[in-house]
Amino acid sequence: MKNLGIIIFSAIALSSCHTQKNVTESSPTPISATEPVKSNSAFFSKITEKSTFEQVKINSKINIENGSFIPTLNATIYIENGQKTWMNLTALFINVARGIATPEGVKAYESYNKTYIDSDFSYLNNLLKVDFIDYQALQNLILGKTFIPINDRDFELTQNAQGYTLSSKNNIKINVDSKTTEYTVKSDYSSDFNLAKVTLNNLSNQDQLEVYYNNWENFEGNSFPKNVKIIIKAKKTDQILIENTKFDFSKIATPYSVPNNYKKTAIK
């Protein structure tokens, strides 16, 4: 089930644009300035802008490192802004998984074990070791936009040689089902406000989520990162690397139905 989770998440939650250049943890770290930016309203307004496209189709190659052999996956991702994210995955010319996310939740199936899931967003939250992902946060994560809850009270903005660093000055508290989780958050942005790196630390168990974005390109008024890398650090470390090869704004059909004889899998 964990392999199914990694496959589904990597396709449905982490693709954005096109061409290749690897994203690595050794990317230059911005040198933080000591003085906070006092007039930060323009910055917060810019990084929370909503996407304006109607739909985008993305072709991607996905490599997963999680201790098990998973071949390179070819993914087609289709996003209707604010409504749904659909994906289809193949490996070695064989269809291996398909899924769809909407504001109501996530549905997906995989053909190797003939299993499927039908869940709210607790599935992706469990996989990412967080608890604040809903549909809009998921779409923002896919597109390299700010996907964590932010406000100018709990964050400090500094400017540096590479752009900006937004750091939590107070622990970020997320309350879900009467359970409160606290995080520390640090986000790096380029000088033109493109997201470069996000690091979240769960203070209750020391789980960590890191997301890297690189090689941004503007296409018809929309900015997209060409490469994405995600690292999930818990009892073990999983890494997902995305090479996006093509995108366009055409509409496509997004069929989804679970084949006969597939077994529903409990969320773990």
Regions found by a protein language model. Give the residues of each.
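N-terminal leader/targeting segments and the immediate start of mature chains
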Residues: 18-71, 263-268
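An acidic-aromatic
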Residues: 84-136
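Positively charged n-region of N-terminal signal peptides that target proteins for export
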Residues: 1-5, 19
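Gly/Pro-enriched, hydrophobic low-complexity segments
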Residues: 19, 154-261, 265-267
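C-terminal low-complexity, charged extensions that often adopt amphipathic alpha-helices
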Residues: 127-158
